[in-house]
Amino acid sequence: MNYKRLIPCIFIYQGKAVKWFDNLEILSDDVVKLAKKYNDMGADELLVFDLSTTDEEHDHAIDLMKKMNRVIRIPMVAGGN
């Protein structure tokens, strides 16, 4: 059966969720909580982009993605840096 899938995106920049690649307006200070919210609201999958610019930020983003994965039950796809 074919059906449409709801796949929200979280863009992580400096440990926070921002609006878009070129719009760094903060949507949430807690990306883990945001991922859980999307999961609980019925998303089919979660797409996460790491917009970090340094190795330190990248390592922090990876840690956040691991934490996100622990609190959601839907598949997560990640990309970026």
Predicted regions and their residues:
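Conserved N-terminal beta1-alpha1 strand-loop-helix module at the mouth
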Residues: M1-I72
